[in-house]
């Protein structure tokens, strides 16, 4: 009997969600090496014996799940694969230094197509001063899977985990939220129209911002640098890859606390609001921010004593505060009612 046929006590993947699945699969894996400081359970593993520690993370993008070649330029895909991997380094308050790239492809991709993919990889490496130092190319029966291992470094005293938030800390987020998912919605809408009418030529100029946010996200290495210049070490941090709600719940779980964020303080770009207004299901912009994902902004908490240093930082918004252990994670609406935050499970793209 094959592994796929094994049915006794079967649990479907979508019953757990990505992070509960990782937790279940890695249960019992304890660090064996003395220089393993942090294993599974954060944005990066942390290793090393000296003052400067090594950060290691891995991220995969799968065709048909994380990207659609009908509207994803290969150069953008290469750039994005590196960007989302080194975003994990930023989420630990570190600096990315090296990457390795693994690509599995079918024979429908040409050498020239892979050269275009690697041109995007090179562009992101050049922008963020990262070296490509290895990798692997393998075969796939269908589609492409692109995996990037990111390596970085951080001073031991500045590494920021998810578990350091404490009651009364301020909750901050960089940039704006929901725009990447809004870009995906536009692309999926235009794809459906094109499939029904191949002569259709979409006009996407007015969606330039949300499209770039989805197709070519930028890791917020700049925020890490400015925080360091201001002498601020966040008490906890995570990157917003799966939506604000999911990331807040990660911090609350790991830090054993609750939180309150204020709906009117969540930063949302006007193009996101516009896209939501065009959708037939009356989508709320704040829903994109909470559950959309793909923004790769930094969500972090700071001690109240650092408020003066952070409150005027360009592109950083204070959206709420951490509450006591046992308190729920909620969003406060403009009408002063509360909505309990819920994380999404497995979701394609």
Predicted regions and their residues:
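Extreme N-terminal cap/leader segments of soluble proteins
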Residues: 1-73, 101
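Glycine-rich anion-binding loops of enzyme active sites
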Residues: 51, 97-190, 321
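Short, acidic (Asp/Glu-rich) active-site segment that either coordinates a divalent metal cofactor
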Residues: 55-58, 145, 161-225
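Short pre-catalytic strand/loop immediately N-terminal to key active-site residues, enriched for Gly-Thr
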Residues: 72-76, 210-215, 235-236, 286-288
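Small-aliphatic-rich amphipathic alpha-helix that forms the alpha element of a beta-alpha
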Residues: 74-98, 119-127, 226, 244-251
């Amino acid at each position: 009997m094959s592994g796929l046929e094994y049915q006794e006590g079967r649990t479907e993947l979508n019953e757990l969600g990505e992070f509960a699945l990782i937790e279940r699969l890695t249960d019992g894996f304890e660090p064996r090496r003395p220089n393993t400081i942090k294993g599974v359970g954060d944005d990066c593993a942390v290793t090393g014996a000296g003052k400067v520690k090594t950060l290691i993370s891995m991220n995969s993008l799968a065709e048909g799940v994380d990207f659609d070649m009908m509207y994803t330029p290969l150069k953008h895909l290469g750039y994005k694969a590196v960007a989302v991997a080194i975003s994990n380094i930023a989420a630990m308050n570190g600096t990315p230094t090296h990457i390795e790239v693994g690509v599995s492809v079918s024979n429908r991709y040409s050498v020239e197509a892979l050269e275009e993919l690697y041109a995007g990889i090179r562009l992101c490496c050049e922008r963020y001063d990262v070296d490509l130092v290895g990798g692997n190319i393998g075969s796939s029966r269908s589609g492409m899977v692109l995996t990037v291992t990111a390596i970085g470094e951080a001073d031991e005293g500045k590494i920021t985990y998810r578990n350091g938030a404490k009651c009364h800390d301020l909750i901050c987020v960089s940039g704006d939220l929901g725009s990447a998912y809004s870009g995906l919605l536009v692309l999926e809408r235009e794809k459906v129209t094109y499939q029904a009418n191949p002569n259709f030529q979409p006009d996407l100029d007015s969606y330039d911002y949300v499209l770039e946010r989805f197709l070519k996200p930028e890791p917020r290495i700049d925020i890490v640098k400015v925080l360091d210049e201001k002498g601020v070490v966040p008490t906890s941090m995570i990157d917003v890859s799966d939506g604000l709600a999911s990331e807040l719940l990660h911090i609350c779980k790991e830090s054993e606390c609750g939180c309150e964020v204020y709906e009117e303080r969540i930063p949302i770009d006007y193009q996101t609001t516009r896209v939501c207004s065009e959708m037939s299901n009356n989508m709320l912009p704040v829903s994109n921010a909470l559950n959309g994902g793909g923004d790769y902004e930094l969500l972090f908490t700071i001690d109240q004593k650092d408020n003066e240093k952070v409150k005027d930082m360009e592109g950083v918004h204070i959206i709420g505060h951490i509450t006591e252990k046992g308190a729920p994670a909620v969003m406060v609406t403009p009408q002063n009612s509360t909505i309990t935050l819920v994380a999404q499970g497995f979701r394609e793209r």
